[in-house]
Structure formats: structure tokens, C-alpha cells
């Protein structure tokens, strides 16, 4: 298990509690199915990297306890965040867009 997630109780597919979102997203670099990667930092910044290019954005937990991101100049999106757990080990996160229902998974590298 990722050391930063020690003490977190998680089941596969369970919602990430609002209080655990910062710990969950900053626990390590996430790798997506298409090979893109993303890093979230504790100061609310994020960098998404794909095909040799980087995009800088921001992340936050909104007043409703949801994970949200902002990509300048104007794109905002909020997601339902769920744990990916295999053999009792937290291996990543599942994001589902609240606006469009699109789901994607990121695995800790």
C-alpha cells in the first residue's frame, strides 16, 4: 500500500470521503489507460502530461465535498471519486464526471 494512504479504509468502488480526497489525489503520480499521467500537489496544483506535453491546472474539494478541477482559461469539472482496490491494496482512483458521466481510472505509479 502507498505509505501516504496508511490508515485509510477503502473498498473497491467505495466513494472517497471528502476528508480523504486530498490524501487520495496527492498519494502519488496517476497513470491512465492511454498512458497519460497526472500529478496533484498539496497546494492545489495539478499537471497532466500526455504525448510529451504538459497542461497545468488546479484541483480542489468543493463545498459539497466533491473533487473538482479547473483548467485555464475556463474549464471546470467535478467528479465522483472512487477507490480502486485489488487484494486489499489501494491501487488507484476512479473518476466519474458529474456532468457527462464519463469514467476513467488512474493507477498509482
Predicted regions and their residues:
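Lipid interaction determinants
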Residues: 1-58, 62-109
Amino acid at each position: 500500500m502507498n505509505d501516504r494512504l496508511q490508515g485509510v479504509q477503502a473498498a473497491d468502488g467505495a466513494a472517497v470521503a471528502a476528508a480523504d480526497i486530498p490524501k487520495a489525489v496527492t498519494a502519488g503520480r496517476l497513470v491512465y489507460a492511454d498512458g497519460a499521467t497526472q500529478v496533484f500537489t498539496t497546494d492545489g496544483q495539478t499537471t497532466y502530461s500526455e504525448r510529451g506535453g504538459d497542461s497545468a491546472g488546479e484541483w480542489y474539494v468543493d463545498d459539497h465535498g466533491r473533487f473538482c478541477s479547473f483548467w485555464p482559461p475556463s474549464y471546470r469539472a467535478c467528479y465522483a471519486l472512487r477507490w480502486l482496490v485489488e487484494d486489499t491494496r489501494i491501487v488507484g482512483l476512479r473518476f466519474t464526471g458529474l456532468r457527462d458521466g464519463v469514467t476513467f481510472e488512474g493507477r498509482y505509479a
